[in-house]
Amino acid sequence: DSQAVEIAKIAEDCGVAAVAVHGRTREQYYSGRADWDIIKAVKEAVKIPVIGNGDIFSPQDAKAMREYTGCDGLMVGRAARGNPWIFKEINEYLKTGIVPEKPSAEEVKNMILKHASMLIEYKGEYTAVREMRKHIAWYTQGLPHSAELRRRCNEIVSWESLKEVIES
């Protein structure tokens, strides 16, 4: 706790414009709860903007962190895997108090194909379609028949086979 505050003060004194604080230690990795008290202590100790990170899995979590810590911004990590809509959901909830509807299966399918297409453009087909396997698992988590879809996706080796599986 005091180490985070000390480091943030040093960064501020060196002219840093903002700091991001993760409320979890390296030793914790993903276990246990993020300690939002650390984020709050840093926010109270410095004048520069503080970005809070740790255990933001929903719009409600984002609001709770902002209210509890007073942080100026939020950083979302694991909750964005397979859920790029979370940023819009958080923004909408913070503005209106209403959580938008989850994307439809069709919207998820279209996003998977767009994501894969962009990844292929960036990394090439061979690498991209293999990397998409884990992304597809994240995108489809909790959807009906997702276990069978994930099994089939683990066999994809080309853009064509990926499209065939996703569009079927």
Set out the residue ranges of the language-model regions.
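Glycine-rich, proline-tolerant flexible connector loops at the mouths of alpha/beta enzymes
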Residues: 21-31
